[in-house]
Amino acid sequence: MKNFNLLAVSSILLVDLFPTHCGHNVDLSRAINLNGVSFNNVDASSLGAAQVRQSASRGRGLGENPKNEEGADKQKKDEKKVEPKKPRENKLKQPPPADGARAEDGARAEDGARAEDGARAEDGARAADGARAADGARAADGARAEDGARAEDGARAEDGARAADGARAADGARAADGARAADGARAADGARAADGARAADGARAEDGAPAGNREGGQAGAGGNQAGGQAGAGGNQAGGQAGAGGNQAGGQAGAGGNQAGGQAGAGGNRAGGQAGAGDAGAGQGQNNEGANMPNAKLVKEYLDKIRSTIGVEWSPCTVTCGKGVRMRRKVSAANKKPEELDVNDLETEVCTMDKCAGIFNVVSNSLGLVILLVLALFN
């Protein structure tokens, strides 16, 4: 045995030290030297030629046509000097003041018209017109319309005075205009009662009549406007009510559809769950079928242990892998062993999972035995 060990060690050393030029056993020092030689022995002429080419290209790039480059630089500078600078444009252009001037002209025209109306304020009727125009809501008074109708007579100075009093009551604050109207009415009692007062009264009556007409027209317009607004309000209210009804109906219908959709979804979900339950039941049946032992195997094992079987579980038919075990049912506990049948037994599949451990124990034991034998022989 000692000779065998020496032979094995010597053979291993010989294989490692034997220099073979085939395969992977190559002299490492020789390979390193070859690599160094191939790395150091570089062609110096090729490197020198490359350096010469590089220096020549650099000199050519730097020294070629310096005059042309200077001329190009001068041309660029001259172009920069000659190019005129663009004036900055004001992008914020203001609109022409034509509309403002027109607005001022319109305002001036209105002021001029008002000044002419002020000059005519001595007539007495202009005061009533101005008061009625200022107080648009007062234009619907029936008393003023009657005063204007009375002013159409022309000869009745007292009616004109009453119209002036009505104008005074409408204006309230214009006492001066009322005084002028009273003076005009009093002038009818003097020497001008025949000519100037009658002409003034006629003019006032004419002014009063259009005022009455204007007044009535304004009242009618106001009534029509109010009626139109009321009608529009009624139509709007009716439209809103109809829209509300339609909206409510639409919401109710949407709610019904939603409820129906939810009910259908619930039914489908319930059906799906029922189907899942069926699938689970089928899977359970399949598992039970997989767990059910073979009838032939049960019968054979019953014939072996018929005399010893009881209400306790019998040992498994195998020591490694899947097998069968059985016991008597409670109803067949008092039966004789010869009368037992497969229907009198409860059977199930048994599995033995410790097979690997057994094999490990066996292999380890065999290894120990071999080692002991070797030790004894040595």
From Swiss-Prot:
Compositional bias segments (type: Gly residues): 214-283
Localization: Cell membrane; Cytoplasm
Bias kind Low complexity: ranges: 127-140, 163-200
Cleavable signal peptide: 1-22
Required for the binding to heparan sulfate proteoglycans (HSPGs) on the surface of host hepatocytes: annotated span: 80-88
Stored Gene3D superfamilies: Thrombospondin type-1 (TSP1) repeat
Disulfide bonds: C316-C350, C320-C355
Lipid modification (GPI-anchor amidated cysteine), residues: C355
Extent of the Sequence repeats: 99-104, 105-110, 111-116, 117-122, 123-128, 129-134, 135-140, 141-146, 147-152, 153-158, 159-164, 165-170, 171-176, 177-182, 183-188, 189-194, 195-200, 201-206, 212-222, 223-233, 234-244, 245-255, 256-266, 267-277
Topology class, membrane: Lipid-anchor; GPI-anchor
Region (6 X 11 AA tandem repeats of G-N-[QR]-[AE]-G-G-Q-A-G-A-G): 212-277
Region spans: Disordered: 50-291
TSP type-1 domain span: 304-356
Glycosylation sites: T319
UniProt keyword list: Cell membrane, Cytoplasm, Disulfide bond, Glycoprotein, GPI-anchor, Lipoprotein, Malaria, Membrane, Repeat, Signal, Sporozoite
Entry's Gene Ontology cellular component terms: cell surface; cytoplasm; plasma membrane; side of membrane
Domain of life: Eukaryota
Region I: region residues: 91-95
Family recorded in the similarity comment: Belongs to the plasmodium circumsporozoite protein family.
Function: Essential sporozoite protein. In the mosquito vector, required for sporozoite development in the oocyst, migration through the vector hemolymph and entry into the vector salivary glands. In the vertebrate host, required for sporozoite migration through the host dermis and infection of host hepatocytes. Binds to highly sulfated heparan sulfate proteoglycans (HSPGs) on the surface of host hepatocytes.
The name this protein goes by in its record: Circumsporozoite protein
Biological source species: Plasmodium cynomolgi (strain London)
Lineage: Eukaryota, Sar, Alveolata, Apicomplexa, Aconoidasida
